[in-house]
Design a protein with these regions (language model features):
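Oxyanion-binding/catalytic loops of NTP- or PPi-dependent enzymes
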Residues: 1-181
């Protein structure tokens, strides 16, 4: 990677990953960090992105950042969207006798609506509707989902994320009560 920077005429001193940059920004802007002679403030950063989840544990004192552990898994928001898509595609296949995944336009419409539904569920535990007009062959389709069903669909991905969190906690040798809240 540094080779390409040198080709561009840039002198790169060091590269850092996303979570280290996040921790560094936290340490720079936090004014209430403990003095160097006091016990460190331990913070865990979790970034659940579109394609994966990153977790990092760091300890802070004024002017000092120590990265304790970091981890990554390939479970993110995209996986959640795909699980919802599969669920509704199966439901629409049974109810309306259509194969959603044979039609790219219909698949994209369904995925777009699933993303919207996921965002609504972040703030709502009630049963929420999904309605798509002129979905396939000019048919309107509808369904619904609540957060409990959503969590059931993504349970495997949540387990992957939990495993990364546990692995980071184990590697950092931190206990839950030692983490700053």
């Amino acid at each position: 990677m540094t080779y390409f920077y040198r080709m561009a005429g840039l002198n790169v001193l060091k590269l850092m990953n996303d979570t280290t940059a996040t921790a560094l920004a936290y340490g720079i802007y936090k004014q209430d960090l403990p003095e160097p002679d006091k016990p460190s403030r331990n913070v865990v950063f979790v970034d659940c992105g579109h394609t994966g989840t990153q977790v990092a544990a760091a300890s802070f004192n004024k002017g000092k950042l120590t990265m304790l552990a970091s981890g990554y898994c390939n479970s993110g928001g995209r996986n959640f969207d795909e699980e919802m898509c599969k669920h509704f595609a199966e439901e629409f296949s049974q109810r309306f006798k259509m194969n959603v995944f044979e039609n790219k336009k219909a698949t994209l419409k369904l995925l777009t609506e699933c993303v919207k539904l996921k965002k609504l569920m972040a703030a709502n535990t009630n049963r929420l509707p999904i309605n798509i007009e002129c979905f396939m062959d000019d048919k309107d389709v509808s369904g619904h989902m609540d957060r409990a069903k959503f969590e059931e669909l993504i349970a495997g991905h949540l387990a992957d994320i939990e495993k990364v969190m546990v692995d980071v906690m184990t590697a950092s040798k931190l206990k839950n009560e030692e983490i700053y809240r």
